Amino acid sequence: MARVTVEDCVDKVPNRFELVMLAAHRAREIASGSSLTIDRDNDKNPVVALREIAEETQSAESLRERMIESHQTQIEVDEPEEDQMALLMGSEVDRPVQDDMSEEKLLRALMEAQGQN
């Protein structure tokens, strides 16, 4: 029956290779739980997909669009962190300046600040 179904589909999708790709995609959709547009009649998913294409309950154009969408992927580009970005751009890293103040100098400065208040 599959051979007759393929021959029935050739007038809908003239390129047999494209027909196979579309029918395989539709068979995968059926296997993943998509609802059937025709009766199964004890046929396997690829035959049901071919019958749907032959009876035009699934248009070749909509199948083609869904197949293209299923093969598209979104690639995220990792941006470098701010510190790395500054170095890459040739500027210095934005960090607080470290003082060479010893503990004794810090205490003396605090005492002077408290004495002035």
Swiss-Prot record:
Enzyme class of the recorded protein, top EC level: transferase
Reaction it catalyzes: RNA(n) + a ribonucleoside 5'-triphosphate = RNA(n+1) + diphosphate
GO biological process, one term: DNA-templated transcription
SS bonds (residue pairs): none
SUPFAM superfamilies, A to Z: RPB6/omega subunit-like
Domain of life the protein comes from: Bacteria
EC numbers for this chain: 2.7.7.6
GO terms for MF: DNA binding; DNA-directed RNA polymerase activity
Keywords: DNA-directed RNA polymerase, Nucleotidyltransferase, Transcription, Transferase
Gene Ontology CC: one annotated term: DNA-directed RNA polymerase complex
Binding partners and assembly: The RNAP catalytic core consists of 2 alpha, 1 beta, 1 beta' and 1 omega subunit. When a sigma factor is associated with the core the holoenzyme is formed, which can initiate transcription.
Annotated function: Promotes RNA polymerase assembly. Latches the N- and C-terminal regions of the beta' subunit thereby facilitating its interaction with the beta and alpha subunits.
Family the entry assigns: Belongs to the RNA polymerase subunit omega family.
Protein name: DNA-directed RNA polymerase subunit omega
Source organism phylogeny: Bacteria, Pseudomonadati, Pseudomonadota, Alphaproteobacteria, Rhodobacterales
Gene expressing this chain: rpoZ
